[in-house]
């Protein structure tokens, strides 16, 4: 079995990345996506100081890490688009490894994605609909337009 070195690095540094993300979200007030991007840059900068990591590996590492966020989205067209990503399989494998270590909701998430991959179109649609029932999207707020003030 061949293993991509970028996958190994992404797996080894997942938890240091998570620690940096938590710090950035708490102290910097950043949203999840921005915190992951900045934390990923910091972790990879530290890695590149001690190891020569070519860009072809660092870009794959970033993709795997950012796909962990996309794997959380199981409604609408997100699952189909996520599965079309070139590095989906590596990201799913990392999710499965995390599920073995972390347990809890990660196990359920990995199980759902495993089932989604093995399903046909109709079964996938049903899986997504079940998720939409469990986690409905918030209703849009509609605001009335204010009447313009009369000029005196």
Where would I find each of the regions flagged by the language model?
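Catalytic cores of the polymerase beta-like nucleotidyltransferase superfamily
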Residues: 1-152
């Amino acid at each position: 079995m061949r293993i991509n070195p970028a996958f190994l690095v992404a797996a080894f540094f997942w938890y240091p990345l998570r620690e940096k993300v938590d710090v950035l979200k708490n102290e910097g007030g950043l949203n999840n996506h921005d915190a992951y991007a900045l934390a990923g840059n910091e972790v990879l900068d530290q890695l590149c100081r001690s190891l020569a990591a070519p860009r072809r590996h660092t870009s794959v590492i970033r993709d795997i890490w950012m796909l962990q966020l996309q794997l959380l989205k199981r409604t609408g067209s997100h699952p189909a688009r996520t599965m079309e990503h070139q590095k989906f399989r590596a990201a799913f494998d990392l999710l499965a490894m995390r599920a073995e270590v972390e347990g809890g909701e990660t196990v359920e998430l990995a199980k759902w994605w495993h089932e989604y991959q093995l399903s046909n179109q109709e079964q996938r649609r049903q899986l997504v609909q079940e998720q939409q029932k469990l986690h409905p999207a918030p209703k849009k707020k509609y605001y009335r337009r204010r009447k313009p003030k009369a000029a005196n």
